[in-house]
Amino acid sequence: MRNASVTARLTRSVRAIVKTLLIAIATVTFYFSCDLALPQSAAAYPFWAQQTYPETPREPTGRIVCANCHLAAKPTEVEVPQSVLPDTVFKAVVKIPYDTSAQQVGADGSKVGLNVGAVLMLPEGFKIAPEDRISEELQEEIGDTYFQPYSEDKENIVIVGPLPGEQYQEIVFPVLSPNPATDKNIHFGKYSVHVGGNRGRGQVYPTGEKSNNNLYNASATGTIAKIAKEEDEDGNVKYQVNIQPESGDVVVDTVPAGPELIVSEGQAVKAGDALTNNPNVGGFGQRDAEIVLQDAGRVKGLIAFVALVMLAQVMLVLKKKQVERVQAAEMNF
């Protein structure tokens, strides 16, 4: 009986281990198959920064890493209060303006609307406010925006997107300020806020490869001998540009669907010359701001000090008037 019980337990354990391994293998397979099947569509999403730079999205130079894939510079604005009190909810507004009539190149080469995304780097201790602390008025401004922390231990770094650009050129973040009275690691004072905002797909993947939302150049000097259009089983179109150097073998440059060819067969090109136009209409921008975590006691003290100064000035004016009246009475006497 004892041996049978031990055997049963071992059998159940083995089954559990096998089941866990199968789930893990299926998950990994699904992840990589999606990455291979749809690499261009995923490259525009902010979570690529999380995977490539897990510690922080800001380099030591101050540049936010989204600029490594979104090469064009575009304006981004941020609005935060000059100062806030502890344990209060305020809003940070990130503005990502662009021409809504513009269309970008999609993963399949078709023209589609632009998406937007943003990263908000708050000071330590600041975080997205819980739902029960958000007023109805502020909730209306937020809409259905989903805020994702950069990592489990970095609630002060928040990413958003991709979102439809036509609806979200302004993204409202509900932020809860920390309370130094309950967290001894937090101190009153001035802090920096860093913001990055992008519109449209990136031009480079985190691996360094170009996306189809980029300019393609000739890799050799010579004459374009042939331009062949190819289509794979999934219907994805690409062009093979054959360049014949003065000596040596033909060099083949592959151009995906999306950018428009601006060269033709028989045309002479030099290495580095553009084979296509630049289809990118988006870009990335970042801004820095400052916010003060204000001590309520100091604010009250400042108000009291200002009131005393004003009262002293009033008393001085009244005293001066009194002296003037006394002097006038003595002169009349």
From Swiss-Prot:
| Top-rank lineage group of the source organism | Bacteria
Cofactor comment: Binds 1 heme group covalently.
One GO BP: photosynthesis
What subcellular locations does the record give? Cellular thylakoid membrane
Disulphide-bridged cysteine pairs? none
Oligomeric state and interaction partners are given as: The 4 large subunits of the cytochrome b6-f complex are cytochrome b6, subunit IV (17 kDa polypeptide, PetD), cytochrome f and the Rieske protein, while the 4 small subunits are PetG, PetL, PetM and PetN. The complex functions as a dimer.
Query: What name has this protein been given in UniProt?
Result: Cytochrome f
